[in-house]
């Protein structure tokens, strides 16, 4: 492998990070919104969310990507590969994040919510000041675990022409006839990305534990 080959795979890593960050930034709050619908048992919407989560969690990322990229034009909606990839990854991770958030909401002490209600605290303020900080702490490990899975799901979008780490390594291996070095380099890059994510989680948890001390 020469410098150009390394750079090609590194550019694939940049694409992986971009797709992951975009879909995570959209999927985490979307998952929270879906979980709140489940928690509040909103009529009709609750059934829709249950069906959505069950369907998407059982659908492979590559199938979802192909469906979005090729089916949406049938309804007059055409997306370039990158927006289509972000949409597919967002839809997928939102379903998994919904269950992470919902688990934290189910285990949230209802007495605290009722106590805030007795003080006539507005609903938005109750959620922002009492519920969200606690479910965020409880959900963080599960959310980060889903983020790592999201990063490892990005090769699925290569089917619509996105050149991420794995696709870039495959191209270099096919061009050089030596597949092992590019895939070892790809493995190192995946490891570094996940390592940074886990270190960020630990920093956040450490800061939260310090802030929570009396």
Regions found by a protein language model. Give the residues of each.
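Transmembrane alpha-helices and adjacent helix-loop boundaries
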Residues: 1-214
